[in-house]
């Protein structure tokens, strides 16, 4: 999984580099704005179904067919929410035909990504995330190849967005075939009563994810209205880099959520073990990530083109927001496994309101930097309260590895300060220095990195046969 995820991020990095170079800050701003709109389409077509079905399949794998079949029917029904949302924006933005077509193309990507995520819920519930990662990697290869070809050939931002939509359709065909072949071993009927129960049970998750994603992307929407596409491009380049880093806690939460859901009521020691190990390694990742970004932010942003020089300081602020998000995302998995999603929902609502108010105050004065400040303020609120709640239920974190991380980070920082070589050599050597020192001092234990199942039989897919 780690190798596949690394491959995905390399492909995404290459595409962002080519798109930023060829489209410029204005075209790149349109591209990223359309991508943000696709997230809202995806969320309105999901409403928490993926999270809920993942949890329920992990508890009772013999219900996979019923949950998937009725979940799929419910997602088709939910098109009545996502399509009008897209239509309203397209009507409002008629004055900018290029942006309108880009949003429409990414809207297709959002709809089919929602269906792909439903298939991923089955994979996760059966702890077979290798299927998800393989199909996602294939999709990224298609997107990167087609997107680069369109951009290099001068087809523009709309063609680039169409590459995303086309690749998501191909991925859906593959995912649906895999789910039917590997996990659906009986016929299931579509029942209104089951769909209604799924909708009601998943709604709290859905509202949480909608508010979370509005909170994460409202700054882009407000920048687009209060400034211009070039400033949106400066901000979203830094934000895109932060999203890449933010996949680390998402992967950890996704991988551990099914196991936490099963263990939360009958094996509290296993839950605490996952909590301690996950927190330890997130802390050891966040320390060098923030420090390295402070030194290299300008060089990283200028790598994507001279137009993106203003993105450097944005990245320096957002990396702190990303750092606290590492822990908030990881903690949210424990809270949802404990049916505390309503508490998370209220917290996200409060943070969203704070973020909107801060953006209204800061963007007119500081533009892209104001949006970054608002993001850091609201993410800090979420981190503080999530940490307080988790510490009450699972105890204080184990900080014994912290001094080793600080020492290793300090040595790495001295290296970055003194040596001004090529960017990627500096990054690679900094990682080697940090990781090597941690390993030598005993901060990293290879036996801890994989959180292994205590029951090998749990890893085997349920075939429905005795």
Where are these regions (language model features)?
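Membrane-water interface segments that mark the loop-to-transmembrane alpha-helix transition
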Residues: 1-8, 34, 43-90, 101-102, ...
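Signature of the first transmembrane helix
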Residues: 1-50, 83, 109, 140-144, ...
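Helix-loop junctions and terminal segments of transmembrane helices
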Residues: 17, 45-61, 124-125, 238, ...
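Interfacial segments at transmembrane-helix termini and the short loops linking adjacent helices
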Residues: 26, 90-106, 229, 276, ...
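Membrane-interface junctions at transmembrane-helix termini in multi-pass inner-membrane proteins
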Residues: 56-59, 112-135, 316-350
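Hydrophobic alpha-helical transmembrane segments
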Residues: 100, 104-107, 134-181, 197, ...
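Interhelical loop/hinge segments that connect adjacent transmembrane helices in multipass membrane
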Residues: 130, 157-158, 173-216, 255, ...
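Membrane-proximal transmembrane or re-entrant/amphipathic helices at the cytosolic face
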Residues: 414-466
């Amino acid at each position: 999984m780690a190798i596949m995820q690394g491959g995905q991020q390399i492909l995404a990095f290459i595409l962002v580099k080519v798109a930023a170079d060829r489209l410029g800050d204005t075209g790149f701003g349109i591209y990223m704005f359309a991508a943000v709109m696709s997230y809202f389409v995806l969320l309105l077509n999901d409403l928490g179904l993926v999270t809920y079905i993942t949890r329920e399949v992990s508890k009772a794998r013999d219900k996979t067919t019923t949950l998937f079949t009725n979940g799929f029917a419910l997602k088709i029904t939910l098109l009545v929410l996502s399509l009008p949302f897209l239509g309203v924006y397209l009507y409002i933005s008629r004055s900018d035909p290029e942006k309108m077509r880009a949003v429409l193309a990414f809207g297709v990507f959002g709809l089919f990504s929602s269906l792909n995520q439903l298939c991923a819920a089955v994979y996760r519930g059966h702890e077979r995330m290798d299927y998800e990662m393989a199909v996602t990697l294939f999709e990224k290869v298609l997107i990167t190849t087609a997107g680069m070809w369109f951009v290099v050939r001068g087809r523009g931002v709309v063609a680039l967005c169409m590459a995303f939509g086309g690749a998501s359709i191909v991925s859906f065909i593959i995912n649906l075939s895999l789910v039917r072949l590997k996990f659906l071993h009986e016929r299931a009927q579509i029942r209104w009563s089951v769909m209604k129960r799924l909708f009601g049970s998943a709604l709290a998750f859905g509202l949480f994810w909608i508010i979370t994603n509005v909170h994460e992307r409202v700054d882009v929407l407000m920048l687009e209205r209060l400034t211009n596409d070039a400033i949106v491009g400066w901000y979203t380049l830094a934000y895109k880099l932060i999203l890449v880093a933010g996949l680390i806690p998402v992967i950890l939460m996704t991988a551990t959520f099914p196991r936490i859901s099963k263990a939360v009521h009958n094996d509290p020691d296993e839950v605490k073990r996952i909590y301690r190990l996950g927190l330890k390694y997130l802390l050891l990742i966040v320390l060098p990530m923030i420090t390295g970004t402070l030194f290299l932010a300008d060089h990283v942003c200028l790598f994507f083109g001279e137009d993106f020089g203003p993105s450097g300081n944005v990245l320096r602020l957002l990396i702190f927001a990303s750092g606290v998000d590492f822990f908030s995302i990881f903690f949210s998995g424990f809270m949802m496994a404990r049916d505390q999603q309503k508490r998370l929902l209220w917290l996200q609502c409060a943070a969203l309101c704070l973020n909107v108010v801060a953006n209204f105050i800061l963007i007119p004065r500081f533009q892209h930097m104001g949006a970054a400040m608002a993001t850091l303020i609201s993410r800090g609120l979420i981190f503080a309260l999530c940490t307080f709640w988790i510490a009450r239920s699972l105890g204080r974190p184990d900080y014994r590895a912290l001094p080793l991380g600080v020492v290793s980070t300090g040595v790495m920082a001295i290296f970055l300060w003194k040596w001004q070589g090529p960017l990627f050599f500096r990054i690679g050597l900094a990682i080697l220095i940090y990781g090597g020192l941690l390993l030598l001092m005993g901060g990293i234990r290879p036996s801890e990195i994989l959180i292994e199942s205590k029951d090998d039989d749990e890893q085997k897919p349920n075939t429905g046969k005795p």
